[in-house]
């Protein structure tokens, strides 16, 4: 991993022996949240996921646990990049972070890390975002993508 772009510790837990139970828990939670996302963002969901790809099957990429220590970061980026099949990004915050550590979008919106909060947004270039460094506490998230 290039530390000028991203500095954190990442662990992919999908298809890793010993992580099957956690994988099932995240899968159930993701499905519940995607159903809610589709209800509240139906037109956007259908446009970005189904119409543009002409596909009806959507799958998740699995789950990556990320630990970001104080002063670690992820620079401005979008999640589609060279992975054209990525359509939505999902991020679960696993702990509260009091100072810094937020996800910031290029619109100025800042999402504070709060345990149990999940965020879903398009993985496309208009949703540029970054992981702002936590100042004093370590931040834990689980992230992944819906793809077609």
Question: Model features per residue range: what roles?
Answer:
Residues 1-118, 126-148:
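Fe(II)/2-oxoglutarate oxygenase catalytic core
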């Amino acid at each position: 991993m290039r530390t000028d772009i991203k500095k954190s510790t990442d662990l992919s837990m999908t298809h890793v022996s010993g992580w099957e139970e956690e994988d099932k828990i995240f899968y159930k939670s993701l499905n519940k949240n995607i159903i809610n996302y589709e209800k509240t963002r139906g037109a956007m969901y259908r446009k970005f996921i189904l119409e543009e790809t002409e596909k009806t099957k959507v799958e998740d990429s699995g789950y990556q646990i990320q630990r970001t220590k104080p002063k670690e970061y992820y620079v401005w980026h979008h999640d589609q990049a060279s992975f054209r099949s990525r359509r939505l990004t999902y991020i679960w915050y696993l702990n509260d972070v009091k100072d810094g550590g937020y996800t910031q979008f290029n619109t100025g919106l800042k999402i504070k890390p709060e345990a149990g909060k999940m965020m879903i947004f398009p993985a496309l270039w208009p949703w540029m975002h970054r992981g702002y460094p936590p100042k004093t506490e370590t931040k834990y998230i689980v992230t992944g993508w819906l793809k077609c």
